[in-house]
Amino acid sequence: MPRLIKKVGSLRRGKRGVPKGVIHIQASFNNTIVTVTDVRGQAVSWSSAGACGSRGTKKSTPFAAQTAAENAIRMLIDQGGMEQAEIIMKGPGPGRDTASRAIRKSGVVLSFVRDITPMPHNGCRPPKKRRV
């Protein structure tokens, strides 16, 4: 007799506790985006400086990045929390250090912090300098 395979329901919109995960911080000169994923790369929660209410040039401030990181961690705690995490930072923006500082203060144990900012090995020509 064939064995019945249990159907696993979708976890979308449901609460799921993630014991270990990855916190991605993408800091550009215009905005800071914080995404929390599990170890497989499935997004659990996210936030950005623009989604937290900052508009225009205020999105690129360190305070807006701190607010985005706190908001992403708060959403994560509401879903069940996370004990251990890794931080992966990308981009040269002004909010990268402030966002990682806010994550450290939240109580999540960090295993390591990695910087994956893309650096050209003399690749494409950069845009011309602004003359204001």
UniProtKB/Swiss-Prot annotation:
| GO term, biological process aspect, one | translation
Q: Pfam families, from UniProt?
A: Ribosomal_S11
Q: Which GO terms describe its molecular function?
A: rRNA binding; structural constituent of ribosome
Q: Which UniProt keywords apply?
A: Chloroplast, Plastid, Ribonucleoprotein, Ribosomal protein, RNA-binding, rRNA-binding
SUPFAM superfamilies linked to this entry: Translational machinery components
Q: Please tell me one Gene Ontology term that the record gives under cellular component.
A: chloroplast
Q: Which domain of life is it from?
A: Eukaryota
**Primary place of residence?**
plastid
Localized where?
Plastid, Chloroplast
Per the record, the similarity remark reads: Belongs to the universal ribosomal protein uS11 family.
Question: Could you give the subunit structure recorded for this chain?
Answer: Part of the 30S ribosomal subunit.
Protein name listed in UniProt: Small ribosomal subunit protein uS11c
Q: What is the lineage of its organism?
A: Eukaryota, Viridiplantae, Streptophyta, Embryophyta, Tracheophyta
Underlying gene: rps11
